A protein has these predicted regions:
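Positively charged, aromatic-accented nucleic-acid-binding surfaces
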Residues: 1-55, 61-151
Length: 151
């Protein structure tokens, strides 16, 4: 039943199952209320990196069509080969997909480290974003290990 519920829009046009945030640059973030599963819209990820949304869409298609065992994907994207990086049951009322947080990180890593085609500004944005994610990720990792919770 969560798939059906996730497809019903609320008054703001997004599923009642999702938390939705848009930052000042128009980057969209989503979290599934019940599970904490997080992700971004393809257009939001593109804005975050300073690239065209078509570039993100090409990577989505490329990983979906890639053979899981034999492909030429960059190392950071290989684990997604043959899989759909979108949330399978959650999308907004316009039926736009939401990319999983792990795929978003892989794309950010690609633009920060592997892409020869990214312009210097996009690469710098990706590197700064990756650094921020790493810092936050390490903090959350340690919090989980020490069982720290905000009071």
């Amino acid at each position: 039943m969560p798939q059906f519920a996730a497809q019903i829009g609320s008054r703001d046009g997004f599923s009642d199952e999702l938390l939705h945030y848009v930052d000042s640059d128009g980057v969209e973030y989503f979290t599934v209320k019940a599970t904490g599963q997080s992700g971004m819209s393809p257009s939001g990820l593109a804005k975050l990196l300073g690239v065209e949304q078509a570039q993100i869409s090409r990577w989505v298609n490329r990983v979906q069509q890639a053979d899981p065992l034999n492909n030429s994907l960059p190392k950071c994207l290989k684990s997604f080969a043959g899989h759909d990086p979108n949330f399978s049951a959650y999308f907004d009322i316009e039926k736009r997909n939401i990319l999983s947080d792990s795929f978003c990180v892989a794309i950010i890593k690609y633009y920060a480290s592997y892409s020869n085609r990214a312009n210097k500004e996009s690469q710098a944005k990706a590197q700064q974003t990756l650094y921020s994610i790493t810092q936050i990720g390490m903090r959350v990792f340690i919090h989980e290990k020490t069982r720290w919770m905000e009071a």
